[in-house]
């Protein structure tokens, strides 16, 4: 029992009550901690919490098949000690290993078996990292101290701020002459046609009353010469384009 010295809390599972007090006292002296007592036939009805004991000692181990329950009752790296067992130790060791215990060993001279609970809690998980992590490259990381901001006012020149001439936006004006293309779609063909008609009407303007040359006092209300000074009879007067068009 010297290998269990320093364990704080132990459980002694007994089958024979004869000299039980002496065996429990010997375990207390060996460990230096507390020792709880439980009957092997009442083990399945016990309600011990998980990870309650540092050491569990069982006498006559063939009388219990609750090794999984004992595994849960032990703390991580807790010890399981069996003595006074009957039969081949190999079969008992195999059963203990299949229940989750590790580091199982036999002391044939003392007729004892010792096993250990793994150093982690039952049901716990750990992250496994099999692949090597490649160092991340800060490709898109920009330092504000090293990067200068662009002044928006410097993006435009004075030429960019000038408004373009509407006449220069027409496709037909690329030739340098005011001549409409064959399939004109910019409106220049209609504009030139209106100018042509207006010019013809201006040149052929005639007086219907014969008093147009006398001045506004003698002109009709719809006379195209209204507002113009008097002129000599037969004198050719060129009218502005807007005077020959309707105001509505």
From Swiss-Prot:
GO BP: iron-sulfur cluster assembly
Subcellular location(s) per record: Cytoplasm; Mitochondrion intermembrane space
Keyword Transcription found: no
Binding-site list for [2Fe-2S] cluster: 172, 181, 184, 186
Main location: cytoplasm
Signal sequence interval, chain numbering: none
Domain of life: Eukaryota
Motif stretch (Cx2C motif 2): 220-223
GO molecular function, one term: 4 iron, 4 sulfur cluster binding
Pfam families: Anamorsin_N (PF20922), CIAPIN1 (PF05093)
Positions that bind [4Fe-4S] cluster: 209, 212, 220, 223
Positions of short motif Cx2C motif 1: 209-212
Keywords: 2Fe-2S, 4Fe-4S, Cytoplasm, Iron, Iron-sulfur, Metal-binding, Mitochondrion
Chain segments carrying region Fe-S binding site B: 209-223
Record's GO cellular component terms: mitochondrial intermembrane space
Coiled coil: none
InterPro entries tied to this protein: Anamorsin, Anamorsin_N_metazoan, CIAPIN1, SAM-dependent_MTases_sf
Cofactor(s) listed: [2Fe-2S] cluster; [4Fe-4S] cluster
Linker as annotated region, ranges: 131-161
Region (Fe-S binding site A): 172-186
HAMAP family attached to this UniProt entry: Anamorsin (MF_03115)
Function field: Component of the cytosolic iron-sulfur (Fe-S) protein assembly (CIA) machinery. Required for the maturation of extramitochondrial Fe-S proteins. Part of an electron transfer chain functioning in an early step of cytosolic Fe-S biogenesis, facilitating the de novo assembly of a [4Fe-4S] cluster on the cytosolic Fe-S scaffold complex. Electrons are transferred from NADPH via a FAD- and FMN-containing diflavin oxidoreductase.
Domain notes for this protein: The C-terminal domain binds 2 Fe-S clusters but is otherwise mostly in an intrinsically disordered conformation. The N-terminal domain has structural similarity with S-adenosyl-L-methionine-dependent methyltransferases, but does not bind S-adenosyl-L-methionine. It is required for correct assembly of the 2 Fe-S clusters.
Name recorded for this polypeptide: Anamorsin homolog
Organism: Drosophila mojavensis (Fruit fly)
């Amino acid at each position: 029992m010297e290998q269990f010295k320093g364990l704080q809390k132990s459980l002694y599972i007994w089958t024979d009550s004869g000299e039980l007090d002496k065996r429990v006292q010997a375990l207390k002296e060996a460990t230096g901690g507390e020792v709880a007592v439980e009957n092997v036939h009442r083990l399945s009805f016990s309600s011990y919490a998980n990870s309650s004991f540092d050491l569990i000692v069982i006498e006559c181990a063939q009388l219990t098949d609750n090794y999984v329950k004992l595994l849960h009752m032990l703390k991580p790296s807790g010890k399981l000690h069996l003595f006074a067992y009957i039969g081949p130790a190999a079969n008992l060791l195999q059963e203990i290993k299949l229940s989750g215990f590790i580091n199982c060993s036999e002391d044939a001279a003392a007729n004892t078996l010792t096993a250990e609970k793994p150093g982690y809690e039952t049901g716990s998980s750990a992250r496994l990292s099999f692949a090597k992590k490649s160092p991340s490259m800060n490709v898109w990381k920009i330092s504000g101290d090293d990067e200068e901001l662009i002044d928006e006012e410097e993006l435009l020149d004075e030429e960019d701020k000038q408004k373009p001439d509407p006449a220069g936006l027409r496709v037909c004006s690329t030739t340098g002459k005011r001549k409409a293309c064959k399939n004109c779609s910019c409106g220049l063909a209609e504009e030139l046609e209106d100018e042509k008609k207006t010019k013809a009407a201006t040149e052929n303007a005639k007086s219907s009353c014969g008093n147009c040359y006398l001045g506004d006092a003698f002109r009709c209300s719809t006379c195209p010469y209204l507002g113009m000074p008097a002129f000599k009879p037969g004198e050719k007067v060129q009218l502005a384009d807007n005077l020959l068009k309707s105001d509505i």
